[in-house]
Amino acid sequence: MIPLIETSALLLGLTALLAYLLGSVPFGIMMARLFGLGDLRSVGSGNIGATNVLRTGNKLAAFLTLVLDAGKGAIAVFLARALLGEDAAQLAGFAAFLGHCFPVFLGFKGGKGVATFLGTLLALAWPIGLAACAIWAITAAVFRMSSLAALVAAALSPLAAFTLGLPSAVVFCAALATLIFLRHRGNISRIAKGQEPKIGKTS
């Protein structure tokens, strides 16, 4: 008989792997091809997320990419929670986020992870997710920069978790926020120079 602790570790490892593979699905590239927009990696910033799809001028493709990228994070969390509990849900959300940023199907060269981050938060603790989405929306509306909105939402998510009385999510939010900042290094440089493209600007 396999010891219980080994079984639990095996299940957690399998959950993380499946969540990572789900996160690795490049919905942006798939939507771009489905709508005849070409290879998304050769468009605009070359990023595989919804913002870059929007640069093609196809709002429906961008919307579907946003929903699907957020959805894969949410689905990973919901399934892991239903099967194994809250710790597994956080692990699955983190793994799905890593899958989007470093997808095995694209040679580990993926997106910035913002939509998957928001979808994961909405599924993991919806008050934090709603707060992050609201912060993103307000910042985007004021400054018209998706990257800046993502950075502000990510930076404030640990504070939102703490303020809302969800201490178990503080470290999770901080870890994902750190990765989002690392993935946005180029954007941060362009923002500082006043060269960051505005939302909706076509390629």
Curated annotation (Swiss-Prot):
Keywords: Cell inner membrane, Cell membrane, Lipid biosynthesis, Lipid metabolism, Membrane, Phospholipid biosynthesis, Phospholipid metabolism, Transferase, Transmembrane, Transmembrane helix. It catalyses: an acyl phosphate + sn-glycerol 3-phosphate = a 1-acyl-sn-glycero-3-phosphate + phosphate. The keyword Transcription regulation does not apply. GO terms for molecular function: acyl-phosphate glycerol-3-phosphate acyltransferase activity. The keyword Oxidoreductase does not apply. One of its GO terms (biological process) is phospholipid biosynthetic process. Pathway: Lipid metabolism; phospholipid metabolism. Its EC number is 2.3.1.275. It is a multi-pass membrane protein. One of its GO terms (cellular component) is plasma membrane. NCBIfam families: glycerol-3-phosphate 1-O-acyltransferase PlsY. Catalyzes the transfer of an acyl group from acyl-phosphate (acyl-PO(4)) to glycerol-3-phosphate (G3P) to form lysophosphatidic acid (LPA). This enzyme utilizes acyl-phosphate as fatty acyl donor, but not acyl-CoA or acyl-ACP. Belongs to the PlsY family. PANTHER family: GLYCEROL-3-PHOSPHATE ACYLTRANSFERASE-RELATED (PTHR30309:SF0), INNER MEMBRANE PROTEIN YGIH (PTHR30309). This is Glycerol-3-phosphate acyltransferase. The gene is plsY.
